[in-house]
Every structure is written in C-alpha cells, then in structure tokens.
C-alpha cells in the first residue's frame, strides 16, 4: 500500500489500484489501519490510497491544533492536516474505487441540516455521493455512510432498535451466491456489528439487492441493482 504523498518515490511491483478513502471517524488512525491492513494482502496488486476529509473537519482539526494545550495529544488532527485532502477536491473519476467510513454521529438526522441540527458537512457529503453515482465509481459505504446513501438515493429510513444497541459478531448468510461479490464466500461469514439503528427492511429490499443477512442484523450487505454502491451495515474491517 502506498499513500499518494510517497507514491512517486515508491516502486510498485504489480498492477496499481487507486482508491479514495473518505474517513469521517473520530478514531482516525485506528480506522485507517483497520481498513488498510486487508488491502495489503491483495496478491498481484499495489494499492495507492488517497485520504479525504470533509472540509469542515479539516478546518476544525486546524483550529484544535492551534488551540491545544501543551501536553494534549493532537496526533489525529496533525495526521488529517498532513495526509488528507479536502473532500471538495475529490473527483471520483480519478479513482478505481472509494471507501466511505462510518461516523460518530448516529444520533444526528440523516437529512439536511435544519435549525442548527445535523452533521456540519452534510451538503458536501451528499454532493460527494452524487458525484460517485454519476461517475459510476465502485464504492463501499460502511455503517453510517450506508444509511445516509440509502436514505439519499432511495429514501430508505432507519429505525432505532427498541432492544438497544446491537453489538457483537454475527454469522450472516450468503443470500446471493451467484452475485460477483458473493460467489467465493461460501454459505456465509462472520460480521462484527456495532449500531443502534436498522434500515427499513421492506424498503431496502425493494430498492437494492440483499447480499448477506441474519435474523439479528437484518440485511447486512447489499448492492445497487444498477449502480456503483455496496452497502455494509457492519464492520468487516474490525480487528479480530
């Protein structure tokens, strides 16, 4: 794996895959390590990663660095400033694929900001989803990102779990073994899950292709019928 800042000095040995990683998680470094580790095992390919951050988060990182106490840990803010590009510069046509992480904003509404509520970077995020859709760039939307995308494209709402947060590792069954993403998966796989919300199952199944599910998780992996998005409500990237 090569980051764009050192790719020019590197000597790739295989076919190059260019990926964009939009990271909206608070645990910036841990999230990126979890996502990059499996990418390093792709035999015969070198992966060039470009990190992106919504401009509002980049601006906030710069402010937090400036205002930090002398002994404060500002490594994750410095990392964003040094290695991440602003989301407003993202052109999906320059990449072979994209990954959209979750975000620690589960309690915020999925729709546009109103009366000061909602995610500060919502408009920029939605514009990014539209650009990806228009360019048909293969994209994995994880957890919160999947909920936002499903709501934006198909008006699929989400519901808070009455039983409380669903946490654990669940075996999800392969519902579409003939699908190109699932033909080597076998009967199913274990999926780490940590979430308070579930997408409306009836509307979800009416608009996308369910790929994997279980009774506990509902649809855990789905794909556009005619589009570039893969929606994953769990976290395959989590460490064992």
Where are these regions (language model features)?
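Amide-donor transfer/coupling interface in amidating biosynthetic enzymes
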Residues: 1-58, 63, 88-90, 94, ...
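Intrinsically disordered, low-complexity coil segments
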Residues: 40, 58-75, 111-120, 134, ...
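Glycine-rich, highly charged phosphate/nucleotide-binding loops
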Residues: 68-93
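Short, flexible loop segments at the rims of nucleotide/cofactor-binding pockets, characterized by
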Residues: 74-78, 115-119, 169-170, 188, ...
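Secondary-structure junction/capping motif
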Residues: 83-86, 119, 223
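Short, Asp-centered acidic motifs that coordinate Mg2+ and/or phosphate
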Residues: 97
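Cysteine-nucleophile active-site neighborhood
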Residues: 100-176
């Amino acid at each position: 794996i090569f980051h764009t800042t050192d790719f020019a000095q590197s000597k790739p040995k295989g076919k190059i895959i260019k990926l964009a990683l939009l990271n909206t998680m608070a645990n910036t470094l841990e999230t990126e390590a979890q996502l990059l580790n499996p990418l390093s095992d792709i035999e015969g390919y070198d992966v060039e990663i470009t990190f992106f951050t919504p401009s509002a988060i980049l601006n906030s990182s710069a402010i937090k660095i400036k205002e930090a106490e002398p002994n404060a840990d500002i490594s994750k803010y410095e990392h964003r400033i040094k290695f991440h590009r602003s989301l407003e510069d993202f052109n999906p046509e320059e990449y072979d694929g994209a990954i959209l992480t979750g975000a620690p904003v589960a309690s915020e509404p999925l729709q546009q900001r109103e009366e000061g509520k909602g995610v500060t970077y919502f408009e920029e995020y939605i514009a990014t989803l539209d650009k990806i859709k228009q360019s048909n760039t293969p994209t994995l939307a994880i957890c919160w990102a999947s909920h936002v995308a499903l709501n934006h494209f198909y008006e699929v709402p989400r519901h808070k779990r009455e039983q409380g947060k669903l946490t654990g590792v669940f075996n999800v069954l392969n519902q579409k073994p003939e699908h190109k993403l699932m033909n080597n998966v076998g009967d199913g796989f274990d999926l780490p899950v940590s979430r308070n919300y579930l997408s409306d199952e009836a509307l979800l199944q009416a608009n996308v292709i369910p790929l994997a599910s279980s009774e506990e998780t509902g649809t855990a992996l789905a794909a556009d019928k005619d589009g570039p998005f893969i929606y994953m409500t769990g976290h395959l990237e989590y460490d064992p």
